[in-house]
Amino acid sequence: MAATDVERVSNEEKRSLAMTGHVGFDSLPDQLVSKSVTQGFCFNILCVGETGIGKSTLMNTLFNTTFETEEASHYENGVRLRPRTYDLQESNVHLKLTIVDTVGFGDQINKDDSYRSVVDYIDTQFENYLQEELKIRRSLFNYHDSRIHVCLYFITPTGHSLKSLDLVTMKKLDSKVNIIPIIAKADTISKSELHKFKIKIMSELVSNGVQIYQFPTDDDAVAEINSVMNAHLPFAVVGSTEEVKVGNKLVRARQYPWGVVQVENESHCDFVKLREMLIRVNMEDLREQTHTRHYELYRRCKLEEMGFKDNDPDTQPFSLQETYEAKRKEFLGELQRKEEEMRQMFVNKVKETEAELKDKERELQEKFMQLKRVHQEESKKVEDKRRDLEEEMNSFNRRKAAMEALQSQSFQATSQQPLKKDKDRKN
């Protein structure tokens, strides 16, 4: 039977049956838990914020460890994404954690394209996963999923409003990743200023249409706490790995001349709230939202570009072969059209070149004729001057000959007079 002949079963036609004995599929949740624990989990965090705002310190504080970090310069030519992957274990749960730092973000004078490197990195991870899915022999079980599950956007504690760079970047990212805005180094402004700053940030995000991640409230188990925590966004956090003695206890805190800011004291900052929401309550939802919402949007757009599309229930579905043939015909038609355009462009170029050559030839011919006329005129002038010169030379030679003849006659006459005088004396 063909696939198109199979009748679709509606929900009304499904029946609920009672079993007369135990079957065993009630162990499916236990099987899933066992498989997940064996396979392990991955979680990828993107930290976006200016250099020196405390991204590395907060990550160390969140996971209660010290990650490898490199000192970042404020003189980067552009934004560079630097991923680091670590294997963590808590009890019998393995976590492959990837932290991606945005090196040089916001350090350039021209910040117009600062977000592009971040967007390109997220799209590249989506593309890598899509290419793995489209393989004939795919291995998603062993594939290291590098898609970004959450973006912690570090906001500079100015106490006034969001920077233009922050608004533009979050607007470009909100359809690609789950954004949780946090106010970094919240101990640098007063509580009253911090409260006003939070209200201002949320107001600007709403007015500019920036969609940040909202903790889910559809699950009764976490609906109440998530609903309360949504009202505390953005979280104002303080990070520190140093331990300070407060009373009889050592706590993680920042020591100042005027007092101590305790990291895990909820009256001092929202670090505990961030850790609860990010790790202990909503980590799996962040992973799920990345796959079912952001990646699916990217995947749908890419498949539509490739020619795939969903069909209405009443229309006959397209097979993969039909889609391939349709796309192939489209590409061949486009190729022929491009070839015809190139051929026509070549013909036009040849005609233009021929016309230019003819114009050049005509110009050269006219120039040649002009030079020929000038040459003839100059030759005639030279010939006339040559004739005049010959006539002058002939006239000169005639006068010279006559002069020489006269001189000869005069010499002979003067030489004969002394001879006559000598003869007369002898006589």
From Swiss-Prot:
Can you give the residue ranges of the Septin-type G domain?
39-305
* Gene Ontology molecular functions: GTP binding
Assigned keywords, A-Z: Cell projection, Coiled coil, Cytoplasm, Cytoplasmic vesicle, Cytoskeleton, GTP-binding, Membrane, Nucleotide-binding, Synapse
Q: Gene Ontology cellular component?
A: axon; cytoskeleton; presynapse; synaptic vesicle membrane
Q: Name one GO biological process term.
A: regulation of SNARE complex assembly
- For the region G1 motif, give the residue spans: 49-56
Q: Where in the cell is it found?
A: Cytoplasm; Cytoplasm, Cytoskeleton; Synapse; Cell projection, Axon
Instruction: Family membership, please give it.
Output: Belongs to the TRAFAC class TrmE-Era-EngA-EngB-Septin-like GTPase superfamily. Septin GTPase family.
Protein known as:
Septin-8
